[in-house]
Amino acid sequence: MIGKASLPYLLLTLVAVAGPPPPSWTDGYVITNGIRMHYWRTGGSGKTPIVMAHGSSDDGLCWANLAKELESRYDIIMIDARGHGLSDPPKVDDAVDVQADDLAGLIRELKLDHPIVMGHSMGSFAAAAFAAKYPDVPRAVVLEDPNLAARPTAPGAGANADPQARRAAVLARNNRSQADLVADCMKNSPKWGLSECEAWAPSKRRHHPDTALGRGVGARPSMSDLFAKIAAPTLILKAEAQGELRQQNEKVAAILKRGQIVHIEGAGHNVRRDEKQRTLAALRPFLARFDGAAVGAGSE
């Protein structure tokens, strides 16, 4: 007989393995910027392409729930960044903006016609760096909670932390079970819901430990520096913020030539996961401006 206390765990175990992507989706590889990059694609002839770049330790399928909301109108390409998902691991001499060139190569290899480029966290830096370096390529840019204002750093965190310790921590998470990771996700991020946690958990098992060994060669440009070079219309979806932090975010966003910032009420760093409906309410009208829009037409 199953006790009441064990029933929730049993149910979680039964559903912990996320189902496969929809059968209409495809996946593949391209050679870009010296690596083999994996991607998932929703497809659809004649649809405006959106390239989605995930955050650190996530992978392409972490976009699945958002992609399902948008695929009827857009051809969505969900990449696995180097060192993530099924893509090749990073290299010790990777430039700090290497992922911008990874995106450029993928777009070229897939022959995407001026895609919209969207990124979260680490992916938002990649998307912004790409749009700054290749200003004539993106039709539009969407940045989910990019780092606009300086954030306090905990002692021992970030670039000063022991890279071997970080590497060991990534490997330890690689070896955790799907059920255990999903349970942690549901406990720590209850607003996400089960399907988001089911997509999140496998990405932690595929995250390559070598991503912990370096932060990239060269000086990392600030978002202010990148924004000054971005020509495409840009939407920033920021976590909820008040007071001075909100003002700082808006000040940096104002550097964009054709930008807008929306602080999503109730959302933390994982904006779309915390508040999907509010995110979609801001995202859909912006994307609709570029459905089949002629590049350079200045859709506003």
Q: Where are the predicted features?
A:
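Alpha/beta-hydrolase fold catalytic core
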Residues: 2-50, 73-74, 113, 187, ...
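Catalytic active-site module of serine/aspartate enzymes centered on a nucleophile-bearing elbow/loop
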Residues: 258-300
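Conserved HGGG/HGGXW glycine-rich cap/lid loop of the alpha/beta-hydrolase fold
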Residues: 35-86
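Flexible "cap/lid" loop of the alpha/beta hydrolase fold
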Residues: 132, 139-174
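Hydrolases whose catalytic domains are alpha/beta-hydrolase-1, hotdog thioesterase
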Residues: 126-130
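Conserved serine/cysteine hydrolase catalytic core
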Residues: 206-254
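Active-site loop/oxyanion-hole signature of alpha/beta-hydrolase fold enzymes
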Residues: 33, 40, 68, 78-118, ...
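Short N-terminal helix/helix-N-cap motif within the alpha/beta-hydrolase-1
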Residues: 60-68, 86-89, 151-152, 246, ...
